[in-house]
Amino acid sequence: TLPFQRAIMNAMGSDYIREVNVVKSARVGYSKMLLGVYAYFIEHKQRNTLIWLPTDGDAENFMKTHVEPTIRDIPSLLALAPWYGKKHRDNTLTMKRFTNGRGFWCLGGKAAKNYREKSVDVAGYDELAAFDDDIEQEGSPTFLGDKRIEGSVWPKSIRGSTPKVRGTCQIERAASESPHFMRFHVACPHCGEEQYLKFGDKETPFGLKWSPD
């Protein structure tokens, strides 16, 4: 893990934090962090888990390129997956059932039917800003998805996305509803003051800027 990832993963894995919203840039490892925490939930805490992605195609690709290699590369998880690499009812493109009885689902977020029937402990959303705002006129993705964790003793909702249009972005809205907002701070190389990084422009005396050649 990288230094900025540790607090995020600690929040994702904590039973005392019910909801985590990660407003991120591209290529920060959100999907890998999410899968690492999910592996912890499945193997150690024995929780049922579910991840939604914007479309069915995204979900199938995620299962093939991220989930299956994660199972292969984590020995304790692979030990719970005797079906790995085989055609088996517990090994499909939408669901993995482990020998400890825990299930993992990976579904597309466009259809309302994908938010029904499942009862899980952990609900996750990857690239929330790319989801439809209203799923077939039944409600927002997080409204529908978080109903799946209402019966859990330790309910958890993890949302993450690169933000899109300010004011209409779902991850921005979700984060703004939280009473707590945390940023990663780094020390100034000149004075040592802890600060979070900002982009500047020609009008501001601060921030990250590009010098013309």
List the predicted regions and their residue ranges.
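Phosphate/NTP-binding elements of NTP-utilizing enzymes
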Residues: 1-213
